[in-house]
């Protein structure tokens, strides 16, 4: 369908890239020539994913453990990545969720999801975006949402609220950063 080198020379970061949707996106980015960075909380999962994908397709999959709730750690890791050269793409895929009746949610339960999905996505988007702005580098950001952004859903209020916030962030930054060649979609 695509030329096997359509992404050659592109550098892409996938959060939550060690499993599930993030791993599959990474697999296809590498298949089409991109150098990919994956991050997540479980280093052994990241290593296994990187090794598996490179054994299938060659290419280069770099990984680093990262708790996306930690803004300072994000800044340090993104700085390290950019020291090797600027990224061209960011996929905001890291997420967390659990099912709970809203009336039973504790503040800690709510914050556990909001810290990953809402805050973490903003922290990493801003860390990458501000470097692109400083360098005058064009880039693309894709943020993964869920259908309940539009439809609502019971028992997932922290995730629905957080994903809705990401949708608003995406639209707002598309207008703010678009004139600088930074494209955002969700």
Language-model regions, residue ranges each:
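Alpha-helical segment proximal to the catalytic Tyr-Lys
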Residues: 130, 175-179
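Active-site loop-to-helix junction immediately N-terminal to the catalytic Tyr of the SDR YXXXK motif
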Residues: 2, 105, 152-160, 172
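Residue(s) in the substrate-gating loop at a strand-loop-helix junction
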Residues: 146
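Active-site helix of classical SDR
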Residues: 125, 162, 170
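Substrate-binding pocket helix/loop in short-chain dehydrogenase/reductase
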Residues: 101-102, 106-114
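Conserved glycine-rich cofactor-binding loop
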Residues: 18-20
């Amino acid at each position: 369908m695509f030329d096997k080198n359509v992404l050659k020379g592109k550098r892409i970061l996938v959060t939550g890239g060690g499993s599930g949707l993030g791993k599959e996106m990474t697999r296809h980015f590498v298949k089409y020539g991109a150098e990919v960075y994956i991050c997540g909380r479980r280093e052994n999962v990241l290593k296994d994913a990187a090794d598996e994908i490179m054994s299938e397709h060659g290419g280069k999959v770099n990984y680093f453990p990262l708790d996306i709730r930690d803004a300072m750690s994000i800044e340090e890791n993104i700085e390290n990545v950019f020291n090797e050269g600027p990224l061209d793409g960011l996929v905001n895929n890291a997420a967390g969720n659990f099912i709970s009746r809203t009336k039973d949610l504790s503040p800690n339960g709510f914050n556990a999801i909001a810290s990953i999905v809402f805050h973490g996505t903003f922290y990493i988007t801003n860390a990458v975006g501000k470097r692109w702005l400083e360098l005058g580098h064009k880039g693309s950001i894709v943020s993964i949402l869920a259908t309940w952004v539009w439809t609502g859903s019971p028992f997932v209020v922290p995730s629905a609220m957080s994903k809705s916030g990401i949708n608003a962030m995406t639209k707002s930054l598309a207008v703010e950063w678009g004139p600088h060649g930074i494209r955002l979609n969700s």
